[in-house]
Amino acid sequence: MEKVYKMPGYDLHLLPTNKFKNITISLKLQNTLDEKTVAKRTLLSFMLTTGTEKYPSTQELSKYLESMYGMKLGANVVTKGKRHIININSICINQEYLPYKEDLIQQQIQLLNDIFFKPNASKTAFDQTMFERKKKELVERLINNQDDKFYYSLEKMFEYMGKGTCLGISSHGNIEDIKKIENEELFSYFKECIKNDQKHIYVVGNVDESIVHVFENCLSFEKNNSIFESVYSFEKNRKDLLEIIEKQDVTQAKLNMGYRISVNYNHQNHYAFVVFNAIFGGMSQSKLFKVVREKNSLCYYISSSYDAFNGVMVITAGIEGKDYHQTVQLIKEQLKEMQDGCFDQDDIDTAKLMIKNSMKKTSDEPLSQVAVQYNRDITEKKETNEQYLEKIENVTYQDIVDVCQNIELDTIFLLKGRNE
């Protein structure tokens, strides 16, 4: 059961469990998703875990982490509806499992403090050599992402589908914006984040309330009174279906279909939609997999996913370009069959078992536990895993039929070969 403590400038969330020998700390900086700041926030996430005043180089920091029994430190950015989140994750062995006493938790928290308040920087800028190196690395990573045609085509679909809305903003920003960022500009924005971002820290492991006092002594931020609007971003920018076909030198075409839905985490039909999605395309023996791939051999892979923050369901498939129209038609037919109730209790039971197993897997991974709890916290949903599974179990055949009636195809993006 989560315990939440109001700390100086942040909320501390404890997720006590004796499942793990490690202590996982996940610090989240969240602010409004804005096209003007995503590139800065992404580059900032690259900078924050590269060094501190005490350990200014990557090598020195790595050596220190190794001396802390292989402590791990990493950062990334994600979007959730109208939020852009910088995650800083630290994982270290629980000191209770050491043969002698050593205050690892305090050092783990102190390192987070140093990242923010004793960075490898002057009064006005990060270390210039490190800044240029991480900026170059980020640009190279985004170029590599474009070479990943699954990732590229999905990003392009969201760009078209969400033009002018949060859905259309890439969580990483674009290459040209990143190239324009200057060191002093990024450092100034870093100071803004420390002051204005809403901060949440999650701790997973065999911990008790004594850790609260360690946080009190080692980490504090300026009090933040920022108020954010709802995290949900259910914004539709047009009425008609948008179909985009792009040609590149690819051997396998990438099909992406974006649907609008009206179900979010707090909606009473959320659980029914989770079960529907599993049956339709979210599990290995889904309708889409069995019919489009196995029966008709029209794709190399196919699946559907549900984004409750943006009100979107997405179908992704790898196909031959020549099979585009036939594949789209077959997908539409499978959705129509679901809407007509052409599924049975075995399908429902299989989906519920898959969801249950997925939740069990989540509880076996500390950062997955954090992700689930964070989703609940930012949507103000008071629910345990047991309550969630009980509501999944209570979903009926009719609930599933009802929830899929108002699914609307919004955007199709196909990336195919030049000669197809």
Predicted ranges, named:
Residues M1-M68, H172-N174, F187-V291, T411-E420:
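His/Glu-rich zincin catalytic helix
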